[in-house]
Design a protein with these regions (language model features):
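Short beta->alpha connector loops at strand-helix junctions that form conserved
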Residues: 44, 451-453, 472-475, 563, ...
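Nucleotide/phosphate-binding sheet-loop regions of phosphoryl- and nucleotidyl-transfer enzymes
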Residues: 2-392, 419, 425-428, 435-440, ...
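Structural motif
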Residues: 241, 411, 428-430, 449, ...
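Structured functional modules or segments
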Residues: 450-453, 457-497, 501-503
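Long, charged amphipathic helices and adjacent flexible linkers at domain junctions
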Residues: 70, 228-229, 368-427, 495, ...
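C-terminal accessory/binding modules appended to enzymatic or scaffolding proteins
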Residues: 17-19, 402-444, 812-828
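Conserved alpha/beta-domain cores
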Residues: 96, 520, 530-883
Length: 883
């Protein structure tokens, strides 16, 4: 509870730019511009603490805060010499929201507050402009009804259209004062019909309604969605800015506009913006009339233009960043309504940062710190040009699981992908959900669309690793796999029809959109070189193929933190050997099948060592449950039985015996190696032989295999598997007469392993946190099923973000921190890494830096994001251990 003496309200002249937390971004910047002596209409800010109190008081404004608002209205009346509700000199205000972080379009604005039936008459006389007065009044009624009382805009738009039709005109500006006065009456009647009460005539009642509406809009669905996407906590709340109105719609010597100090699309150092004469601010943004470019203001009002250019230079120099400004001209007098760091494309962000360094305005560290790591995603993948997106209409939306843009013909199976691609077609693979068997099809598809699965489903994880566009979890699709068609947005799409996916927004289009290839600029290289200079964390990649490994190295990866061996087994040439191994009854049969696989695995590992050129490579032993590899299709079962010379019935029984109720917690990971040590022997042999072979060809490379045992929960389990690995590896190294070293470590992905990490570190030379499984087991929900209920958890503010995309620092993070401390106690030089999907999430990277991890590992296309995030973490909090 706040005490009675809390100050909830600040005049613009009482605040400054450093008070963002209290005054919000807009309020702090208005205060800062006021203190810089800029022409800012006077006003005050109701703090974010008042918003928090509003929610604490069950969505009501308590008497203490209301009293302070009234006190400050009186102060504003004294400063301006105008009065609320006065017939001779009325005070009109705008009410706008402004959170700490800029949230464009999320919160609502009300202009011309203070007008009523009497004041509008006085206003018309005072300004000698009745048309302007009634235009302002009808706008106010419309905005107040929409924003405060939640009566949709469309009803009022309809009345305007009817009026224009009746008068035989096409533009709003062609309506006369008499028409607008009549419209205001019609609007009030509409208000009465919809709400069963009169439109409020008391300006103070209007003001309290508007302030409540801004507080309430902090929790509208748009705002909640934007906050989740941008990691903005709901506890921040929004401030409210109450500001004396200035009018851009007073006639031909008035106007309003928006401008950027540099081009937000390209970063070019040139004023960019537009303005409208005789208009109010909302008109520019709403796109009702076509505005003029900012340079044309030079011809219309040269003095105002010069003053504006001067202010732009001052603001950019003061904030040391590109500014986005709103301004109004009232009877040839310029007023600044807002400035903030402008939103920009990723390419523009890099150019602006480099230019500001070259201009001596910021340091290299500041340049690295000012770029949003997530925005780099857009630079590395194809995109749809803006004009394509403006033209096309989405037919549905799923989750934006892997960025990029793709257009192709619909196919429904992985095999069909290959068939169509062989004919030279571009395809999109549409599945209920993908499985490891679809890997080849996923590899050749331009994009992947799934009905089920979240941001960390199989499809999403694999697609991000390959840099393939993916939209997952589009539950609105009615799938008919048998007949190779689906229904979405009321239309049926068949195999071979064109669709397009936008992996950055999750939008699905029922047509072919053209894509633009990603272009990496020289500025990208400069920023990345600076980032590498400042970061302490190493950045590795999760890669299972030489192609992925090379791609990651191009993006700056310093090694492989996770090479999964199972993906290599789904190749059509190998699947039968692995199936023979799984359904064998005896060790001899198993070893015979494994001996076929060993040279294949060795060749794979050699190719990966070659691609990594001596950088560290961590290879994980077989992890998935065996049932994932066995055939389910009757024809495949028959073929395998024939090949193994056993009956179909016997084989079917073996396959059924592999069925588990909860395979994710079943016979998988190191449990396979304890039951079948010959699997660990074969894989170790392939890893060591591959390393020895590449070392003999490339003596200059430092190759030191890192063998990782998955799903360990008990130190003795690891000791058992490590003995098998050591016996095999040492024998091979000795036979080769080599002095090669290797390391054995484990994945920490079971909570018990985290709690007993001191014991496990006696055996493990490194830990890699498998945060996908660690998150599942700590929360107790499966990532493949969580999508069904997580939405309700977000809506009810139980969770604010997906724990599979962004590490849960309070729970899972605590386990990670504990394991690091326990592991170091036993083995001070233990290497610590993370290889879950969260490894490419900036907030997770910062956490990993702070708890002292050695490296993070993420999919190839996220490597630049992790490099930048690691540098930002080091700039924010340098680590003592790295000095």
């Amino acid at each position: 509870m706040k005490t009675m003496s809390t100050k909830y309200i600040y005049l613009f002249s009482e605040g400054n730019g450093s008070m963002r937390e209290l005054l919000g971004g807009k309020g702090a910047n208005l205060a800062e511009m006021t203190s810089m002596g800029m022409p800012v209409p006077r006003g005050f800010t109701i703090s974010t603490e008042a918003c928090t109190q509003y929610y604490a008081d069950d969505r009501t404004i308590n008497p203490e805060i209301e009293g302070q608002i009234m006190e400050y209205i009186t102060k504003l009346e004294e400063i301006t010499g105008k009065q609320f509700g006065s017939m001779s000199n009325p005070l009109l205000v705008s009410v706008r929201s402004g959170a700490r972080a800029s949230m464009p379009g999320m919160m609502d604005t009300i202009l011309n507050l203070g007008l009523n039936d009497e004041v509008v008459e006085a206003f018309a006389k005072k300004t000698k402009n009745p048309r302007f007065a009634y235009d302002s009044y009808r706008r106010f009624i419309q905005m107040y009804s929409d924003v405060v009382m939640e009566v949709g805009k469309k009803y009022f738009e309809q009345l305007i259209d009817e009026m224009k039709e009746k008068r035989g005109v096409t533009q709003d500006t062609e309506l006369t004062a008499k028409d607008l006065k009549e419209l205001a009456e019609m609007f009030k009647a509409e208000y009465r019909t919809k709400l069963g009460e009169e439109f409020p005539q008391d300006p103070k009642e209007q003001l309290m309604g508007a302030v409540k509406a801004v507080f309430r809009s902090w929790d509208n669905p748009r705002a909640i969605y934007y906050r989740r996407m941008n990691d903005i906590p709901s506890s921040w709340g929004t401030a409210v800015n109450v500001q004396e109105m200035v009018f851009g719609n007073m006639g031909d010597t008035s106007g309003t506009g928006v401008a950027f100090t540099r081009n937000p699309a390209t970063g070019e150092k040139k004023l960019f913006g537009e303005f409208l004469m005789n208009a109010q601010g909302e008109d520019v943004v709403a796109g009702v009339r076509t505005p003029q470019t900012i340079d044309q203001l030079k011809d219309v009002m040269p003095e105002v233009y010069d003053q504006f250019v001067d202010i732009c230079h001052k603001l950019e120099y003061h904030y040391r960043d590109m500014q986005d400004m709103e301004f109004t001209i009232e009877n040839k007098k310029l007023f600044m309504l807002q400035t903030r760091n402008g939103k920009r494309t990723a390419a523009a962000a890099l150019k602006i940062a480099c230019d500001l360094v070259d201009e001596g305005m910021i340091t290299e560290q500041e340049a690295v710190a000012m770029i949003d790591p997530k925005s780099l995603d857009a630079l590395l993948h194809p995109t749809f040009p803006k004009e394509e997106l403006e033209r096309a209409k989405p037919i549905g939306q799923g989750l934006a699981a892997s960025p990029g843009a793709a257009a192709g013909r619909i196919v429904f199976t992985a095999d069909d992908v290959v068939t169509w691609v062989d004919k030279g077609e571009k395809v999109i693979l549409v599945r209920l959900e993908t499985s490891p068997e679809d890997i080849e099809g996923m590899h050749f598809a331009r994009g992947i669309l799934t009905v089920r699965g979240g941001m960390t489903s199989h499809a999403a994880v694999v697609a991000r690793g390959m840099g393939t566009c993916c939209v997952s979890g589009c539950g609105a699709i009615k799938m008919d796999e048998a007949n190779k068609k689906f229904e979405l947005g009321g239309k049926v799409y068949k195999e071979g029809d064109w669709i397009s996916l936008d992996g950055s927004t999750g939008n699905i289009y029922g047509e072919r959109l053209h894509t633009a290839e990603a272009e990496i600029s020289g500025e990208f290289g400069r920023i990345m070189a600076w980032a590498d200079k400042f970061r302490a964390l190493q950045v590795r990649t999760n890669a299972d193929t030489p192609k992925d490994a090379r791609q990651a190295v191009n993006f700056g990866a310093e090694g492989i933190g996770l090479c999964r061996t199972e993906h290599m087994f789904f190749d059509p040439d190998r699947i039968s050997a692995i199936r023979q191994m799984i359904v064998s009854d005896t060790v001899e049969q198993r070893e015979k099948a494994l001996s076929k696989l060993e040279p294949m695995q060795q060749a794979d590992f050699e190719a990966i060592y070659e691609a990594m050129k001596g950088r560290p490579v961590t290879i994980r032993l077989l992890d998935p449950p065996l049932h994932e590899f066995v055939p389910t299709d009757p024809a495949d079962i028959e073929a395998l039985a024939k090949e193994m010379k056993i009956s179909v019935e016997h084989l079917t029984n073996v396959i059924h015996s592999l069925h588990e109720f909860n395979p994710m917690m079943g016979h998988r990971g190191c449990r396979l190696d304890v039951t079948f040590p010959e699997i660990a022997r074969m894989q170790t042999s392939a890893i060591i032989k591959a390393a020895l072979a590449v070392r003999s060809r490339r003596p200059a490379w430092q190759i030191e295999p890192e063998i990782m045992v998955p799903l360990v929960g008990e130190a003795r389990e690891l000791a058992y598997v490590k003995n098998v690995i050591d016996a095999t590896a040492q024998k091979l190294i000795k036979e080769a007469g080599s002095d090669m070293h290797y390391k054995v470590g484990t994945m920490i992905e079971i909570p018990r392993a985290a709690l007993t990490a001191d014991d496990i570190a006696k055996e493990a030379e490194f830990f890699s946190f498998g945060t996908n499984d660690l998150t599942q087991m700590t929360f107790g929900f499966s990532r493949d099923d969580a999508g069904k209920f997580l939405a309700s958890y977000y809506d009810n503010k139980i969770y604010e973000s997906d724990p599979f995309s962004k590490l849960d620092q309070a729970g899972v993070g605590r386990l990670v921190q504990m394991s690091c401390e326990l592991g170091r106690k036993t083995r001070p030089d233990i290497k610590l890494g993370i290889c879950g999907e969260q490894g490419g999430d900036p907030s997770t990277v910062e956490f990993c830096h702070n708890v002292g991890l050695t490296y993070v590992s993420c999919s190839p296309f996220r490597v630049p994001i992790a490099r930048l995030a690691a540098a930002q973490a080091a700039i924010k909090a340098p680590r003592a251990m790295d000095k």
